[in-house]
Amino acid sequence: MDLVDPSQSAAAAAGTQTVKDEVSEKCQKLFQDFLEEFRGSDGELKYQSDAEELIRPERNTLLVSFIDLEQFNQQLATTIQEEFYRVYPYLCRAVKAFARDHGNVPQNKEFYVAFQDLPTRHKIRELTTPRIGSLLRISGQVVRTHPVHPELVSGTFLCLDCQTLVRDVEQQFKYTQPSICRNPVCANRRRFMLDTNKSRFVDFQKVRIQETQAELPRGSIPRSVEVILRAEAVESCQAGDRCDFTGSLIVVPDISQLATPGVRAETSARVGGTEGYQAEGVQGLRALGVRDLSYKLVFLACYVCPTNPRFGGKDLHEEDMTAESIKNQMSVKEWEKVFEMSQDKNLYHNLCTSLFPTVHGNDEVKRGILLMLFGGVPKTTMEGTSLRGDINVCIVGDPSTAKSQFLKHVEEFSPRAVYTSGKASSAAGLTAAVVKDEESHEFVIEAGALMLADNGVCCIDEFDKMDTKDQVAIHEAMEQQTISITKAGVKATLNARTSILAAANPVGGRYDRAKSLKQNINLSAPIMSRFDLFFILVDECNEVTDYAIARRIVDLHSRIEESIDRVYTLDEVRRYLLFARQFKPKISKESEDFIVEQYKRLRQRDGTGVTKSAWRITVRQLESMIRLSEGMARMHCSDEVQPKHVKEAFRLLNKSIIRVETPDVNLDQEDEHEAEEEPQEVINGDASVPSGVNGHVNGMNGHAEEPNAATPKPSLRLNFAEYKRISNLLVLQLRKMEDEDETSQRKSELINWYLKEIESEIDSEEELVTRKQIIDKVVHRLVHYDQILIELTQTGLKGTGDEEVPKEEDPYLVVNPNYILED
C-alpha cells in the first residue's frame, strides 16, 4: 500500500522497528472477504454494485449493514464493535482494495466505510470514558451546525535543515508536526514546513446535538455533545433534525482551552531548605497540566440518518420529491396501503381519529389541524413575491379544553416539529440568536424555534402570555416566512417556512361570549390577521358531553390499549401525508368563481355588523380559503381544487368566525341571580320585577306577585346585535347631553327619550309596554352587569334613608369614563 510503505521504508532507514497490529490486519482481511462474498436475500453479491458506485468523483464512502456483518462472522462484528477506532483505518484500506478490484478508481483516492443498522442505541448522557473507541449509535436533535471546511488528516512535512520529506504524519485533531526528522543524520525537531500539495485533506463539519425531551430523566437539563462529521457525512443534517449518529466516542484536545493565555506548568526537582532531600520531587502539582491536560469528549460519526425516517430507507428533501421518487422509496406493501387510503371514502374522518385518538370531540379543531399538516401550495408571483402555503392555526379556549394536548400530539407526530411555551420564549429564542463560537471566536447564528421547525410545525403554547416585543419578532415569519437578522456584524435572511399552531387562554381565564374575540384574547390585530383559522373552545356544562368526556378519560386510565381506536397507524399516516404533500393542485374556473362568491358573502355579512364579535374579514381570509381548499385537494390526492374542497374550506373558515358569535342576551339573567340570592324577596313577589315598570310588567304577565305564577314565566331575550345597537344609542345620547348641557340625565328621562325615538315603530299599547320593559332591563344590565353606565345617587346622612328611596328609583346616569365605544 502506498499509505504504509513510505513510512515503513523511512522507519527502516532510521533504524527503528515498526510494530504490526496483527488484530487489525486480520480484521482487514476478514472484512475484505465479507465484502467479496456476502450475498443478499436475492442471492446476488450485495456490495459489488455499491463498490462500482464509488467510481463517481463525489462518492467515497461504502455503507455496510452491521446486521449483514453479524450474519457473516459474529466474531469479526464483535471485534469491530469493541475496537472500532483502532481497526477503522484498516477497514478503510479493505474498502480501497475492494473498490480497486471492482472498478477503475484513481490510485490516490481515499475511501471510507460507514455502518448502519446497529442493534442498540445509546443516550447522550451514557457517553462515558469506558465507551471510548467502540462503535456506538446515539440519537439527538441537532441544535447548531458549523460551516464545512477542510481538515488536515495526514500531513507531509519538509525538513528545513536537510530537505527530507516526512510523509503521513497523522494529525491528532490539532496541528501536529513530526517529533523528529526521519533522516538518521539530521536531528531537527522543530523546523518543518507543511507541503499542502502532498498532504491529505477531508471535508470536516462540526455539529452540536442535544438530548430530546423523551430521553430526559426527571429533573435534568438536556446534555449536549459535539459531533464531528467527515467526507460524505457532512451537510447530511440541518439544525432542528432528529438524527441517529453511528461512530465512536473519542478524546480530543480542547483547542479553546489550549489557546487561553497562561504560564506553561513545568516540573523541576529543586533542592532547598536546611536538608536537601526534604524538598526533592515535583513542585507545583496543583498547577500541573492545567494547559496540557485540557481534553474533551466528542463523537466521531461515520454515518447519519434521521431518527424517524419517513420511510424505511433514505430521507428525501421536500424540493426533490415527486410521486415516482416517493413510490420508489416504499415497499410494495406500503405503496398498496397508501393507494388504499387514497381511495377511502371516509378518509377525512379516519385521519382525524387516527391522529387524535385520545381527545374526545372537538372535531372541527382536528380537521383544521389536519389541513394545516397537509398545507397549501406556496407560490411565487412574476415580481418575485412569495405567497406562503403554510396554514397558521390558533386555538383559544377555557382551561381544561385539551388545547395543549393538540399541540403535544402534533409535536410527537410531525417529523419536524418544535414545541415551545410563549412565556418562556424570547424573541431571539423564537427566531435566531447570534452567538460567539468558542474556537474561532467568530459570530455564528444559532437557530431558534421557528428555524428549527423549517418545513414543519412550530407549536407555541401560552401564546397570549408572550411579551409584546417578542410577539413582534414573529410577524415576518408568519407572513413572509423569513427571518431577517442584522446584529453583531451578521446580516442574514433565514428561511422559516413553518406552520404555527398556537394555543392561548382568554383574558380573565374564561371566554366571555358578550365580548368580541379581540377583547377576549391579548393579541395585537396584525398577529390575529396572520392566523388562517381561530378555534374557540368553550367549557360549557352539558350533561351528555360531560358524561362522554368523563367516560373517555376513565377508559383511557383503566384500559389504555383497548380504548385507543386507530383506523391507521401513525407511520401509515406519515407516509400518506408525505405522498399527498407533493401534489400541487390548481384551482379550476368553477372553483375560482365559487371562492369569489363565498368571499363576497363573508365581506357583506361583516359589513352589516352582525359578526362584530369576529375579527375583520380581509384579503388574508380570502388567501386562507384558497390555502385550505388546496389542503383539502392534497388530502384527496387531487391535482385540481374542486368546488367541494372549497365548500369544506369555507365551512371551516366560516365555523371559526361564526363560532365566536355571541348568543342572545338573557335580560332576565340578573333577576334569576337575585332570586337565588334573596329567596325571601321572591316569596314577596318583588325581586323578579324590575324597578320602575312594576305596573306594566304585572299587566303583561298577569299576577306576578304570586310565586307560582312567576316560575313558568319565559325569560326575556334580545338579539346580541340589537342589544349592542340599543346600548350604543344610549351611550351616545348621554355623552351628547353631557357635552351640550354639562348635566346628567335621569333614568326615566333616558327611557322616555329612547321610546320617543322609536315612536314610529310602535303600533299598539301592548308593544309600547313590551318596548318599555326591554329598555328598562337593558339599562339595568348596562349598569349592574356590563358596568358601561354608572348610577349617581344623591348623597345624604344614613338617618335620612327614607327620603332617598324615591330618588334612587330614578337615579342620574352617566357613562363610565373608561368605556370606549366600538365601531
UniProtKB/Swiss-Prot annotation:
One MF term in the entry's GO annotations: ATP hydrolysis activity
EC number(s) stated in the UniProt entry for this protein: 3.6.4.12
Main subcellular location: nucleus
InterPro entries reported in the protein's UniProt record: MCM, MCM6, Mcm6_C, MCM_CS, MCM_dom, MCM_lid, MCM_N, MCM_OB
Positions of the UniProt region annotated as Disordered: 666-713
Enzyme class: hydrolase
Zinc finger motifs (C4-type), residue ranges: 159-186
Positions that bind ATP: G397, D398, P399, S400, T401, A402, K403, S404
Keywords tagged on the record: ATP-binding, Cell cycle, DNA replication, DNA-binding, Helicase, Hydrolase, Metal-binding, Nucleotide-binding, Nucleus, Zinc, Zinc-finger
One BP annotation, GO: DNA replication initiation
GO cellular component: a single term: MCM complex
SMART domains named in the record: MCM
Biased composition (Acidic residues): 667-680
Ranges spanned by the short sequence motif Arginine finger, renumbered to the chain: 529-532
Domain MCM: residue ranges: 347-554
Domain of life where this protein originates: Eukaryota
Chain intervals with Low complexity compositional bias: 692-702
Record carries keyword Metal-binding: yes
Task of the protein: Acts as a component of the mcm2-7 complex (mcm complex) which is the putative replicative helicase essential for 'once per cell cycle' DNA replication initiation and elongation in eukaryotic cells. The active ATPase sites in the mcm2-7 ring are formed through the interaction surfaces of two neighboring subunits such that a critical structure of a conserved arginine finger motif is provided in trans relative to the ATP-binding site of the Walker A box of the adjacent subunit. The six ATPase active sites, however, are likely to contribute differentially to the complex helicase activity.
Family stated for the protein in its record: Belongs to the MCM family.
Full protein name: Zygotic DNA replication licensing factor mcm6
Lineage: Eukaryota, Metazoa, Chordata, Craniata, Vertebrata
